[in-house]
Amino acid sequence: RDLVRSRGLGDVYKRQDYEIVEWNEGNTDLHENKYIERAYQLKKWAFVSDYVRMKVLYDYGGIYFDTDVEVIRSFPDDLLKLPAFTGIESFSLLVSPGLVFACESGNVVAKMMMDSYNRDIFENTGIDTIKTINVRITDLLVCNGFEPCEKKQTVLDVTVFPSSVFCAYDGKIRRINIREDTLSVHHYAASWLPWYRKIRLFFGTKLRHIGILK
C-alpha cells in the first residue's frame, strides 16, 4: 500500500484507507506529566513530541513519521501485519522512532516509553546532554535483549529493521544510499536544532564529503 509520499511542501498523496492526523495544543494534554509540561514551558517542542507520539500510538495505534521522512515504496502487507516496527540509524546504530514507529494500540514498548517519561523531569541542560528519544528507546530495548547492530530483530513486541530499510543514510559514504530493500528515506532536516548547530551539521557533512573525494 502507498502510505504517504511527500516532497518538501509539495503535494501529499494518501490512500483512502489511511488518515493523516495532526496532534497539537488543541487536542493534547500538555500537563499530563512533569516532563511534557516543563519541555513545553521551555519551548523544547521536539521533546514534547517525543512523549506525545508514544501516547497517541499507545492509545490509537498507527504509523508515525518525522516530517522529513519520504516514503518511496509501498509498505508490504507482511510488514503492516507486524504488531509493531521501527528502524535504526546507520551512523549511531540507535533505534530511531523518527524514521518510523508503527504499532497497534496498547503496544508494550510505547507504554514502557510513556512510563519512562512519567518518571522523568525535563531538565534543560543543553541540546547535547538532554536524553533523546533514540537513546531512551534503545536503552529500554537493550535491557530486553536488543543488540545495536545491522540486523533485523524482534524485541518484546517490536521488530527493529536495519538502517537500509527506513533510514537510507549511509554513514560510511555520508550520503543517502537507496537500496533494494529501502522503503523510506530520512532527510535529516534537524528541525529541533538551533541555527548554529544546523550550520555546523551542514558544513561538517560537506567537509567530510570533500575528504572522501580526495
Language model features with spans:
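Short glycine/serine- and small hydrophobic-enriched flexible loop segments
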Residues: V4, K55-G62, D139-C143
